[in-house]
Amino acid sequence: MLGAKLDTSSGRVWFFPNGDPEISELHVKYDPNNMWSTRMKAIARTALDYFDGSVLVGFPDFGGILDIAASLVGTEKLLFATLEEPEEVKRLCDEIQVAWYDAMDDFSELLKCQGCFTDWNNLLSKTPTHVIQCDFSTMISREMFREFVLDYLRLDTKKLEHEIYHLDGPGALMHLDDLLSLEKLSAVQWVYGAGVPTAAHWIDVYKKIREAGKQYQIKQVVEDPFEVYEVMKKVGGTPYSQLNLRKSDSDIMNKILSHK
């Protein structure tokens, strides 16, 4: 919606810069009549009409501010720019955040007829809400996170209610203390990623989140669906865990339904 190129050949959507723009020359603004804005709103309207209240239609995934910046100028160029042109990076991020809020307002107007809101995280809110994130943060230091990311997240938590931060991968854990300093942040969704130990290995992370007065979301794996119960026993609180099952997982489903 802000001008990046799309690649869907892998079955997923990946974003790339449109050419090789200089950050100082790049200015962004949300256009509600942009081809992709119009298309996504048309899809949402069709879903609203077709399902007629039996399905809740959510916000598109708008992404994180620095993640969007990386898709517009390129990850490597953005990394160098944080060192060589920090004020231009902040100026671009300011513009992206304004556009982000404008997009939220635009889609909120369309979706408010449902009486509540949701996004890709599948949680319900009476007011507009959206998972906040910065996957780019795995490549920057704690000091740079405070300089380029934290204030935007703080504003997000003040503007929107029930905000959950998507903390993605062990490389991002160094920013947890700063995230927990956000007074109005509601919860942290810890995604430990592939190829690393699952939820039970991260008890200290969940405890730290709870001790800061935040809720936590466990991204569960189908191989061990009861692991969430073990985490709850040790950490406490009421985590949210989403488990995607197929028809072939009937044995696991029956165990869950009969579990006490």
Q: Which residues make up each language-model segment?
A:
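A contiguous, low-structure linker/loop signature
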Residues: M1-L26
